[in-house]
């Protein structure tokens, strides 16, 4: 399957909307079947955009490329930082970010989501996470053990100076759960305080990186994953007791 992960630089809102149309259709013309945009890619943290206008744009773009599944991650809607999944002019899944990033004041802007989300597309079960969620292995674990996901998609707004942490966490979630992980990060922002973003990263179920020349275009064979070393579902042992032994 051909996948496109945007390397998006957030600029003026109107220009962002124009570029969204252009990039989405250009990716479709190259044969991409699955296209991901990063967190807050249309507005950044400080600007706003009418949610209905955003939905209209997403409907227009996904109608113009009906063979593509779009993960638009994310927009500000209903007091949530929301990842939206669109196809053929319709939204059929969304996920509200659970683990808000307090150092950026996200808890003052949005309310946390109340559920983890996975959806089925073709023969895949796909779990959604958003940026800071990747720090919490329990979420990825639930998407693997309970939802039986094959793939995690993680839009993000990580800074370049912490790219090593971002990539390490993505790799860990892939290896420990034996699933594919796609991390699509903002490349930069020039409209607010100038910001350099981290990279895009893809890891296979063995935790091995999938490299490309541009960090945008990937060819992944979901039907032939690497052999499992440990089955994280069948071999999981649930323990509900933690012993604390005193040294006295």
Q: Predicted segment positions?
A:
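Active-site metal-binding loops of divalent metal-dependent hydrolases
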Residues: 8, 40, 133-134, 157-158, ...
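Short beta->alpha transition motifs characteristic of CBS
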Residues: 43, 84, 95-101, 212-219
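C-terminal beta-strand edge segments of enzyme domains
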Residues: 118-120, 186-248
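CN hydrolase (nitrilase-like) catalytic-core segments centered on the catalytic cysteine
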Residues: 57-69, 139-217
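Active-site catalytic loop in hydrolytic enzyme cores
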Residues: 77-150, 159-168, 224-238, 245
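Short Pro/Gly-enriched beta-strand edge/turn motifs at strand-loop
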Residues: 70-72, 94-105, 181-186
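Active-site-proximal beta-strand elements of phosphoester/diester hydrolases
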Residues: 1-12, 125-133, 153
């Amino acid at each position: 399957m051909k996948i496109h992960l945007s390397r998006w630089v957030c600029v003026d809102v109107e220009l962002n909307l124009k570029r969204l149309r252009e990039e989405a259709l250009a990716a479709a013309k190259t044969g991409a079947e699955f296209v991901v945009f990063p967190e807050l890619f249309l507005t950044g943290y400080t600007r706003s955009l009418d949610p209905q206008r955003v939905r209209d744009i997403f409907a227009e773009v996904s109608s113009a490329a009906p063979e593509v599944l779009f993960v638009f991650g994310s927009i500000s809607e209903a007091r949530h930082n929301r990842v939206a999944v669109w196809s053929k002019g319709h939204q059929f899944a969304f996920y509200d970010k659970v683990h808000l990033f307090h150092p950026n004041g996200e808890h003052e802007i949005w309310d946390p989501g109340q559920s983890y989300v996975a959806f089925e597309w073709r023969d895949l079960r796909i779990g959604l996470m958003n940026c800071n969620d990747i720090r919490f292995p329990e979420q990825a674990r639930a998407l693997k053990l309970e939802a039986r996901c094959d793939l995690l998609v993680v839009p993000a707004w990580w800074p370049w100076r912490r790219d090593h942490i971002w990539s390490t966490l993505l790799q860990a979630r892939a290896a420990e759960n034996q699933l594919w992980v796609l991390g699509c990060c903002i490349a930069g922002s020039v409209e607010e305080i100038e910001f350099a973003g981290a990279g895009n990263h893809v890891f296979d179920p063995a935790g091995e990186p999938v490299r490309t020349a541009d960090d945008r275009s990937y060819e992944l064979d979901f039907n032939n994953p690497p052999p499992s070393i440990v089955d994280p579902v069948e071999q999981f042992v649930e323990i509900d007791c933690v012993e604390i032994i005193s040294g006295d």
